[in-house]
């Protein structure tokens, strides 16, 4: 398929980080509000906020976020940022998106976690009204932070449950802070009733995927370490888990050292449920259309495959049953003309 056709395809995205996905124009706008100097030249600014094509590691990749953190410290900034990412998604025919963020990273200047979530939800709501997209929020804890900080944040933001906030996650340094370290807090938080997704297997540790599945988590981000792990793949499928794949990001961070190391083909051939995602649109210099192009190029992914992956994404989403039903209907209708070709 040509790029213009891939762009027209209806899409769903489950794994997109707010702070890693801001457009250059919005970064400039936020920098002006925060009175932070950033380059006016696009190429210079892009170099500042985009990770190298090949990083030394995940932690090397995550350094890029340090530039954005000071820009997301006010309600106005967070609302603008959320609206910006929804707009970017809608312009490439994303009909459903879950945008994740860590309130902790926007509390440097006195905002509470509740205020951070409220501001993000306001931006999502503006984007939904303007573009006809469904956009939800996932709150992340930071693995390397004190568990007490994450515990307090998760408890405090519950007032936004099912008002746009639909789930929780842990992001950050997976290697040193595996699921076992987080297990008790994850179980506590699951008791609140909102679902969990979890970054798992991004750092090359298959056992972390096992641990996440054993915690009853039904959506896992990246899962690159599942590659060539037949027993783990069988467990993944038996437990009805959906993979949130992030191809460009995984090559950058060396989670997958080569295209051949990326687990998509093994997941697809085994019948596992999966979704295609950007992870960080700006930090990885990508969007969903670019990701789809890469899947066509490297894996010969077909329109029928894309429909199936998007159906998997919507079914595994944290949207309400009624929203899922409407989104699946919208998705199927959008693909009819392409499937017939």
UniProtKB/Swiss-Prot annotation:
Reactions mediated catalytically:
adenosine + H2O + H(+) = inosine + NH4(+); 2'-deoxyadenosine + H2O + H(+) = 2'-deoxyinosine + NH4(+)
- The EC number of this protein is 3.5.4.4
Sequence positions that bind Zn(2+)? 15, 17, 199, 279
**Where do the catalytic residues lie?**
202 (proton donor)
Q: Which molecular function GO terms apply here?
A: 2'-deoxyadenosine deaminase activity; adenosine deaminase activity; zinc ion binding
Family (UniProt): Belongs to the metallo-dependent hydrolases superfamily. Adenosine and AMP deaminases family. Adenosine deaminase subfamily.
Task: Report what the protein is called.
Answer: Adenosine deaminase
What is the native source organism of this protein? Streptococcus equi subsp. zooepidemicus (strain H70)
Q: What is the lineage of its organism?
A: Bacteria, Bacillati, Bacillota, Bacilli, Lactobacillales
